[in-house]
């Protein structure tokens, strides 16, 4: 069960109930009304299904959020395998794996909870590397964005224009927008770390190339033919086939040249996906 924590927190603030969209993996999809037992005395009721997504309402008392975090595990991508029936307890391999995942599958600059997956291009950055970039005169601009379910969902339609991309919550504050506009005005490049950052920046940029402070949900689907307005270069990992992420970088660079680069990466045994290597595209 993977939950949209940011949406759940907003629903909790608005209604007093923690309810959100979830991805449920089960041998059989639970019917609406089914009560799920999640450990730590937490139960969740399935409200409805929307395509691959299930709407779930959680119940757990006053300290629900504390127990939810204690019961939950880091939502690793499905291709990263862990023992499905591990021995539980202090100091066990399962606990050590979980502690390592919570550290490794998180960027050093993360501040707000809410993403269902790490913005994996950011995993390459350390505090020392960020300090070294700043020392060289690189202005690091921070925005808030919560990676959503769309990062896991392949494109299954024949015409990619028919694909419905999931929205992701973001915040671009006044300071970030001002820094980016000032840099662009001075002829500096805007280098986005990760495809979600690309989508957010492009979503907030007008036809004249000026970015505005905003917050909300970004549902911009970028595929070949899109004209970029803000981003000049991208740092990104190697992505799954048939993914919106691969389509985005194909739109930025050129599909055939991207596929040629992927072939070189395979031949040279580069690491792919979340814990893999990154590429710089300009």
Located regions from the model:
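Surface-exposed, charge/polar-rich loops and edge strands
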Residues: 1-282
């Amino acid at each position: 069960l993977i939950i949209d924590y940011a949406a759940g927190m907003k629903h909790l603030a608005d209604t007093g109930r923690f309810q959100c969209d979830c991805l449920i993996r089960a041998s059989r999809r639970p019917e609406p009304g089914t009560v799920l037992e999640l450990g730590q005395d937490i139960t969740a009721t399935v409200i409805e299904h929307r395509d691959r997504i299930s709407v779930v309402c959680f119940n757990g008392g006053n300290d629900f959020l504390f127990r939810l975090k204690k019961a939950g595990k880091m939502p690793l991508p499905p291709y990263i395998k862990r023992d499905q029936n591990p021995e539980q307890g202090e100091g066990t391999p399962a606990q050590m794996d979980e502690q390592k995942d919570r550290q490794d599958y998180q960027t050093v600059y993360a501040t707000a909870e809410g993403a269902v997956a790490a913005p994996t291009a950011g995993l390459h950055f350390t505090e020392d590397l960020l300090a070294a970039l700043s020392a060289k005169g690189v202005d690091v601009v921070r925005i808030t964005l919560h990676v959503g379910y769309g990062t896991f969902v392949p494109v299954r339609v024949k015409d990619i224009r028919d694909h419905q991309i999931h929205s992701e919550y973001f915040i671009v504050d006044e300071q970030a927008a001002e820094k980016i506009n000032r840099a662009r005005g001075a002829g500096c490049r805007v280098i986005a770390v990760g495809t979600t950052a690309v989508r957010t920046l492009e979503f907030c940029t007008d036809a004249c190339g000026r970015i505005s402070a905003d917050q909300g949900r970004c549902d911009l689907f970028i595929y070949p033919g899109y004209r970029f307005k803000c981003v000049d270069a991208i740092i990104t990992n190697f992505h799954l086939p048939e993914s919106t992420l691969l389509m985005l970088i194909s739109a930025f660079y050129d599909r055939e040249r991207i596929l040629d680069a992927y072939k070189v990466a395979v031949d040279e045994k580069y690491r792919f996906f979340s814990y893999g290597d990154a590429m710089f595209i300009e």
